[in-house]
Structure formats: structure tokens, C-alpha cells
Amino acid sequence: MFYLVGLPDSTVKESHQRIISALQVNGYRMPTSNIVINMAPADIRKEGSAYDLPLAIGMLAASETIQSNELSHYLLMGELSLDGSLQPIKGSLPIAIKARELGFEGMIVPRQNAREAAVVNNLK
């Protein structure tokens, strides 16, 4: 079970089922301990399903199911489907611009968003 704190909207709150289903379909098990995810800063509303992928990967990394040594270099965004697939998101270009401004090496986004995000120079 995991809990989201930090002003998530209803779509972000609903990510719970998408993440659990996607992880299970892809052969991962949810950690057995309770997980609290702090989406800081708490005063800024988090909207949309694009947080699904980073939340899922963060949980896998925190539980040491996957190695996380390179994750901090990349910004991850994407919606997870109940069937475990990665779905496109809105706004990948402005997200990519911000990722470059913040010094990320690259972005991991759904294939359908790759061309738009690739417009930004100096970002893998």
C-alpha cells in the first residue's frame, strides 16, 4: 500500500491502481511495507497522470528492486495503463525544456512523446 501526500489532484491520487496493476503485469511485486510518497512542495498542486512512471520507478528503486544509481540524472514522466503499458502525456516539450534548465542529462518519456521532447538540445 502507498500513500501520496503533498496536494495531489484526483488523477494523481488514482495513480495508485494504475501503478499497482502496471507493476504486477510487468512482473514486479509491490513492497510489503507501507510507503508514503511526499510530493513536495506541499503548497503546489500536482496534476495529471504523468507522475505514474516516476512514482512507480521511485518505489522500485526505494525498495531496491531496481538499481537507482543513474536515475537522478534523468527526468521520468509517463502515464501507466492498467495493462502495464506506457501511455503518452501532455506537455512533454515544456517538461523537456525545464529538465534541461534543471541540469538533467536526459528524459525518459513514452515513445509517443519522444520526438517532441527530442527538440530540446543537450538532453538525451
PLM regions: where:
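Peripheral, non-AAA+ core regions of ATP-driven protein-machinery
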Residues: M1-K124
